[in-house]
Design a protein with these regions (language model features):
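A short, flexible beta-alpha/helix-coil linker loop
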Residues: 28-32, 82-83, 118-121
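Conserved donor-nucleotide/metal-binding helix-loop-beta segment in metal-dependent transferases, i.e.
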Residues: 1-29
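Catalytic donor-sugar/metal-binding loop of nucleotide-sugar-dependent glycosyltransferases
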Residues: 18, 89, 99-118
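A recurrent flexible, glycine/aromatic-enriched loop bordering the glycosyltransferase active site
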Residues: 29-38, 55-74
Length: 188
């Protein structure tokens, strides 16, 4: 991180004339000539689309979809908001913080801030052999955070709903893969 990233992130909540209680950072996930952000692109985006199709319109799902990079871990909060937030300690942290902001703050008090045009960070291994590590664990924790929030708002998750969600997610993921491929082809 450099000072300008921190300043960009903190400014909206530090400026007393702004109404923001939370600022969520975002940045392009491009590095070494490839598109990164696998979990956002291949899990979160198609899952949120599939959930909307399966469980119907939920303002919470629209809220999560409104974030350009919902899994960025960079966020700033006004100190008076902290006591009301239950912040997860697993890979569901980013979704959990957004969920807590949804629960405790007015939507217009949350903003998004571009904090860098090129920022890259440590990438996790797929960890296909060990579901308790890497992207496997990350994906599980993120899904749990989303499902728990929806369940706490009254969505009932049954085995049939999960089967339908799985099929719908798969279709949405394939459609997005085609879109990502086309985007990569157009942009070299």
């Amino acid at each position: 991180y450099d000072r300008s990233m921190l300043a960009s992130l903190v400014y909206p909540v530090a400026n007393p004339t702004f109404p923001y209680q939370m600022a969520k950072g975002y940045y392009p996930r491009i590095g070494e000539g490839k598109l990164n952000g696998r979990v956002t692109r291949l899990l979160v985006s198609p899952l949120l689309i599939a959930l909307k199709k399966v469980v119907g319109d939920r303002d919470y799902l629209d809220y999560l979809r409104s974030f350009r990079y919902p899994l960025s871990g960079e966020f700033a909060l006004r100190t008076q908001t902290l006591p009301d937030l239950r912040i997860p300690s697993d890979w569901g942290l980013e979704i959990g913080v957004l969920s807590e902001a949804w629960r405790n703050l007015a939507p217009q008090s949350v903003c998004q801030v571009e904090i860098s045009d090129a920022y890259d960070h440590k990438h996790q291994d797929l960890s296909e052999e060990d579901a308790s590590k890497g992207l496997s664990r990350m994906s599980t924790d993120i899904c749990k955070a989303i499902f728990r929030k929806l369940a706490s708002d009254g969505t009932v998750f049954t085995p049939n709903l999960f089967r339908t969600l799985k099929a719908t997610y798969y279709r949405q993921a394939l459609d997005l893969l085609e879109s990502y491929y086309n985007d990569a082809t157009m942009n070299g």
